[in-house]
Regions:
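C-terminal accessory/connector segments of nucleic-acid motor ATPases
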Residues: 1-25, 33-34, 207, 227
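Basic, low-complexity terminal or inter-domain segments flanking catalytic cores
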Residues: 19-20, 24, 41-320
């Protein structure tokens, strides 16, 4: 199911919405009582919500025209895990959707409802199963291998494909190779080969989709396993961080890409690594967890921050 960050990422990929636009839309739908609380970092629901989830799935199929022909036998257990729900469960449509004329909503809100509805149906739908075949070929002492897939049961993929077919910009799926029927020991005649030349390409510029993913996982290897908050920012603040960079002139949008400006590049060059590395964020979060457990002193932590700030101001006076 969707937490806020994953919803923001997919809304950017499918619709081109910025993280802030998605946050504003889900907040509006929450205030209209059509979506549950949006600022969540959980992708699961609790076991006491099973009946409600079944009811919501039926409502989604009745109320959202895109899914009117969908018939599902939901497996709610796949999205139920009490241990993975903290303050708030995953984002879901609410039972109030039953009373809503969806066609009267703005197109942008309808798109978010379709996205959240699709995720719920896919997450609880029938399993997608396929048979994978691997062929090994021997030629002139060299061994060549290839793989192909044959779909046995499309399952939840059919719902995802239905959703993607409604998009103006079609998503490209990875098409598995269809292999011819062969048997062990077959000899293939008339096989040809050719050489093609390819060049490495530089990494792609960040989109809000990929930047949100990077923020979510930044410095994770530096955090203790049981630290509650990891990465840069929280689901509720990451959109604001991106918008602040754009409004401050340190980044700009070009199509779906986020590009650092000259001022942004210069800022990163002059800032000390201590500030630009996610390691400091990890250290602070780890210490805050220790304070919560009574294993570290809050006053000493604050004094350390004050001391570090003073040292940085002295070492880099031009930044103040």
């Amino acid at each position: 199911l969707y937490d806020l960050t994953t919803l923001q990422r997919e809304a950017n990929r499918y619709y081109g919405f910025t993280a802030q636009q998605t946050l504003d839309l889900v907040q509006t739908l929450y205030e209209k009582k059509l979506l549950t609380y949006p600022r969540t970092d959980s992708q699961f629901i609790t076991d006491d919500m099973e009946d409600t989830a079944r009811q919501v799935i039926s409502i989604v199929c009745r109320q959202l025209p895109l899914f009117s022909d969908v018939s599902v036998t939901p497996d709610i257990a796949r999205v139920t895990d009490n241990s993975k729900v903290t303050d708030h469960h995953a984002i879901l449509p609410t039972v109030q959707l039953e009373k809503q004329d969806v066609s009267a909503l703005p197109q942008s809100e309808q798109k978010i409802l379709n996205l959240v509805g699709m995720r719920l149906l896919c997450a609880t739908g029938e399993k997608h199963t396929y048979a994978e075949t691997q062929i090994s070929l021997s030629c002139e002492g060299y061994e060549f291998k290839t793989k192909g897939k044959t779909v046995v049961q499309n399952g939840w993929k059919s719902i995802e494909e239905l959703f993607k077919s409604s998009l103006k910009t079609k998503e490209k799926d990875d098409l598995a190779k269809t292999l011819p029927e062969v048997h062990e020991g077959d000899v293939l005649d008339g096989v040809s080969a050719s050489v093609t030349e390819h060049f490495t390409t530089p990494p792609k510029q960040y989109t809000e989709d990929t930047l949100l993913s990077a923020m979510e996982t930044a410095g994770n290897d530096q955090f203790d396993d049981d630290t509650e908050k990891k990465g840069l920012g929280t689901p509720a603040t990451r959109a604001g961080i991106i918008e602040k960079l754009v409004k401050s002139g340190f980044a700009e949008r070009k199509g779906k890409s986020l590009i650092p400006t000259k001022d942004g590049c210069n800022l990163v060059c002059v800032l000390p690594e201590q500030i630009t590395s996610p390691k400091m964020t990890a250290e602070w979060e780890n210490t805050l967890m220790e304070i919560e457990r009574g294993k570290a002193d809050a006053d000493a932590f604050l004094s350390g921050i004050v001391r570090m700030t003073g040292d940085l101001v002295k070492a880099y006076p031009f930044l103040s």
